[in-house]
Each structure stands twice: as C-alpha cells, then as structure tokens.
Amino acid sequence: MKVVMDSDSLIKLTRAKIKEIVVENLDVYIPPKVFEETVTIPKKEGFPDAFLIEENLDKGLLTIGESNADQHVEEMITSLGIGYGESDVFKLYKSGGFDIISSDDRKFLKIIDALGIPYLTPTALIVYLFNKKVLTKENTIDYLNNIKDIVSDEEYYLARKEVE
C-alpha cells in the first residue's frame, strides 16, 4: 500500500515505536514540508525522533515525494483552509499513485473524508498491520498502549476493540 503521511502521524508512529515496522511493510512517502516539520527543524532543536526519521530516509525506507499540483488543487487548498504540512500532503496525494493518506489531524481528516479520500489514523495503521498478520495480538496491544497518551481516547479504544 502506498501511503502519504503527515507530520502528526509520522511522529506518533515514531513515539509508539512502530514506525520501523510501518515503513518496512508499507510504501511511505512524505512531502517536503513534512520533512521540514519532522526532521529539519526538530534536528536543530535536538529532538531524537528527527534523527530516527532521517535514518529511515537514508535507508530508503521512507521517501520524500514531490508533487506537481495544478492550479485546481492549489485553489482547493486555499478554499478548504488546509494547513501548512497538510497542504503538501494533499498536493502529493492528488498528484496520483497513492492509496491513502495517514494523518491524525482532526480538521484535515474531516476535509479529506468529505472529499472521499481514503485515510488511516496512526492507530488504524497499527490495526491494519495486525489484520495483515504483520503483528501479533500481543504486539498490537503493546504498540497501541505506547500511543495511548498521544491519541484520543476514542481512537485508542476503537483500535483496541478491533484487535480483541
């Protein structure tokens, strides 16, 4: 599955200690603004997540994708009020060839849901890997517990219910 991921999702999966498994089992792309938000700026501030994400890029497990957004897509971004990093995610997805967007930004998810764009939240990605038999039930619960404090209670409990 070919995924365009935003900063929020990438950071949450990193903190859940499952990002490595995600990037090894899915074809994950991030746009330049997400790279800036998750690597360039945080590295300068000494955040360890940034170094882990950069390592995945260096190993080819994560790809920076460039979009060729047309004027129509740019107008959609402006009229829908899509934010900084998410605008790059949206442009990359609309450039074609991607299956889903991974995000946990509520406002962005409402917009892409209304547009019929498929998406998975970080917890849903973990459950997806469980359903694909990449993760055991025990591993899945451990990863969900790792992410519990940084996702909504609803997200967490829905994901747990899917696994049990």
Where are the language model's segments positioned?
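Active-site-proximal, substrate-binding regions of enzyme catalytic domains
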Residues: 1-96, 106-109, 113-117, 155-164
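Conserved SAM-binding loop
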Residues: 101-102
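Acidic, PIN/NYN-like endoribonuclease modules and their adjacent C-terminal/linker elements
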Residues: 109-164
